[in-house]
């Protein structure tokens, strides 16, 4: 009895809770990083054309952009014995587990269900890829909100998101490393099966372990029921009335969308410049990262993804994919190293020099990848892009913090910003609780890790709860419901949306470009070209007060 009580107290300790929550962060990033590496070659192997393969990769980001606001609003108003966040985390985790089962077994399931398995195999594989990408990226939203709920004190908030960023990086490293191993010749092959079955079986075990850790998270201890604002009559909902919850979530979403559209359209010029520069930089980097393994397998190793298993062409392609996975692992490792020293680099050279150097380094690395036929040079170039990855994770959000610390200087035309309404006039509705103020932004997404443990600027976590919110009045017409007010978190979320948008455009167009050019080198050429465009827009970013006079002239 005493031992059980001691274990219970140990698990409820703040550091233990921090580790338990961030275990899921680690598991999510392992699955997403391995998916980014392995899914494009897998789609090509089953006969999906290049242009359609890239479109499949865009399903998850597009659905994420649409569904994240609804999920954030629904999570904020959820009431249940397991808290507000974990039911959504578990539901999305089920989608991830289903995708990890479907992807390596699509052919086997199709053969069981119909005599002509090819169309069904493609459909099941696309369903699995879409589920993995969508559920994996969207699951970060309630997870980050859970961290914010549990660690409200500013100091604890910064520590929580430092550990969060580290687990993102660690998960990315492992996720990129696992596909680089030849599992067909490993000791696990007799038990788990082929390369795909071994890899996705391990991912399932890792992810199940990480999800199980959330069962021990004491969410209720840190999160009580949200009371309606004083003077407002919120509708009373039965804790088991799911239709009522759904109606409330949709109603709040309807109130949010017009307000968010208004806020985005009125984005100040300084933030707009930063958003465009970040979008172009992320588009270049994601074009490189999404299609790097396919480029190495087809372009560098001269393999053929659609060749029969066991043939020389297929063997070369598989070797190239494993070498590409190693290159992305090095990218993640270099990103982690630069994140750890980013603060010193900025203090030594300044934000402008470090940011421009990181953006300029990318087209150099991508250009070397296009021109060289050496595996060592191409792998080293992939590792160099980790510098760009690290800078994009951190510096744009530091600049946004600077803008908000000196609003009168950098954001003089912030119309309608009254500093927020009183608590008697508003009900807080969370929207897009992305990487929070007080931590390097991991962008989890999705795709890859590499934020590191850089101590964040104090101004980034000044509030007790690091969430993105807008104020919505309850029980009023739509026009009267919106209360003026715009904080740093909303602008950070808008900047963070550049990451999701950066995956959509390459997914739509890169396949067609490669088919027209008849060469996978077009992936790297396009990435280098986008990198050059990003350099131009990076030079237009406002880094200090002197830039305001220069760009307004």
Swiss-Prot record:
One of its GO terms (biological process) is sucrose transport. PANTHER family: SOLUTE CARRIER FAMILY 45 MEMBER 3, SUGAR TRANSPORTER. Prostate specific. Expressed in all prostatic glandular cells. Expressed both in normal and cancerous prostates. This is Solute carrier family 45 member 3. The chain crosses the membrane at residues 19-39, 52-72, 88-108, 120-140, 161-181, 198-218, 275-295, 323-343, 353-373, 382-402, 522-542. Induction: Up-regulated by androgens. It comes from Homo sapiens. It is found in: Membrane. Keywords: Membrane, Symport, Transmembrane, Transmembrane helix, Transport. Belongs to the glycoside-pentoside-hexuronide (GPH) cation symporter transporter (TC 2.A.2) family. Marker for prostate cells. May be used, in case of prostate cancers, as a target antigen for prostate carcinomas-directed cytotoxic T-cell lymphocytes. It catalyses: sucrose(out) + H(+)(out) = sucrose(in) + H(+)(in). It is a multi-pass membrane protein. GO terms for molecular function: sucrose:proton symporter activity; sugar transmembrane transporter activity.
């Amino acid at each position: 009895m005493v031992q059980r009580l001691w274990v219970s107290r140990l698990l409820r300790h703040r550091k233990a809770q921090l580790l338990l929550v961030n275990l899921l962060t680690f598991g999510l990033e392992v699955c997403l990083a391995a998916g980014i590496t392995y899914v494009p070659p897998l789609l090509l192997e089953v006969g999906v054309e290049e242009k359609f393969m890239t479109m499949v990769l865009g399903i998850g980001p597009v659905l994420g952009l649409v569904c994240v606001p609804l999920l954030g609003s629904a999570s904020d108003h959820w009431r249940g014995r397991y808290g507000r966040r974990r039911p959504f985390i578990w539901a999305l985790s089920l989608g991830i587990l289903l995708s990890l089962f479907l992807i390596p077994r699509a052919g086997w399931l199709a053969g069981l269900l119909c005599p002509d398995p090819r169309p069904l195999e493609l459909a099941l594989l696309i369903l699995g890829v879409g589920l993995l990408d969508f559920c994996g990226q969207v699951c970060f939203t309630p997870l980050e909100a859970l961290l914010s709920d549990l660690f409200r004190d500013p100091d604890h908030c910064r520590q929580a998101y430092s550990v969060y960023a580290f687990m993102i990086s660690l998960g990315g490293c492992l996720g990129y490393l696992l596909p680089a191993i030849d599992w067909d010749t490993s000791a696990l092959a007799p038990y788990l099966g082929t390369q795909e079955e071994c890899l996705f079986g391990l991912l399932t075990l890792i992810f199940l372990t990480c999800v199980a850790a959330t069962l021990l998270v004491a969410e209720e201890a840190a999160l009580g029921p949200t009371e309606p604002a004083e003077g407002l009559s919120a509708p009373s909902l039965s804790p088991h009335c799911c239709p009522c919850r759904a109606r409330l979530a949709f109603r709040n979403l309807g109130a949010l969308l017009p307000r968010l559209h208004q806020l985005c359209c009125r984005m100040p010029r300084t933030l707009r410049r930063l958003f465009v520069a970040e979008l172009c930089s992320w588009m270049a980097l994601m074009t490189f990262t999404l299609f790097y393994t396919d480029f190495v397998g087809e372009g560098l190793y001269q393999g053929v993804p659609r060749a029969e298993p066991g043939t020389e062409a297929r063997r070369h392609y598989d070797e190239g994919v494993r070498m590409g996975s190693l290159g992305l692992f090095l990218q993640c490792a270099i990103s982690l190293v630069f994140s750890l020293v980013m603060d010193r680099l900025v203090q030594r050279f300044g934000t402008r020099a470090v940011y421009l150097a990181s953006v300029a380094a990318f087209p150099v690395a991508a250009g070397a990848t296009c021109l060289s036929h050496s595996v060592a040079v191409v792998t080293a170039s992939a590792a160099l892009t980790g510098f760009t990855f690290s800078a994009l994770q951190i510096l744009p959000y530091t600049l946004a913090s600077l803008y908000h610390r000196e609003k009168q200087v950098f954001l003089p035309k912030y119309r309608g910003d009254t500093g927020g309404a009183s608590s008697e006039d508003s009900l807080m509705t969370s929207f897009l609780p992305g990487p929070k103020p007080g931590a390097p932004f991991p962008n989890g997404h999705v795709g890859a890790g590499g934020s590191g443990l850089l101590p964040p600027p104090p101004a980034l976590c000044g509030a007790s709860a690091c969430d993105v919110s807008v104020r919505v009045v309850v029980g009023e017409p739509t026009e009267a419901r919106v209360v003026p007010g715009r904080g740093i978190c909303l602008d950070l979320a808008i900047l963070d949306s550049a990451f999701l948008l950066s995956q959509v455009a390459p997914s739509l167009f890169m396949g067609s470009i490669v088919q027209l050019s008849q060469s996978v080198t077009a992936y790297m050429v396009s990435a280098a070209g986008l990198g050059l465009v990003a350099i131009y827009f990076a030079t237009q970013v406002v880094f200090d007060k002197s830039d305001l006079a220069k760009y307004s002239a």
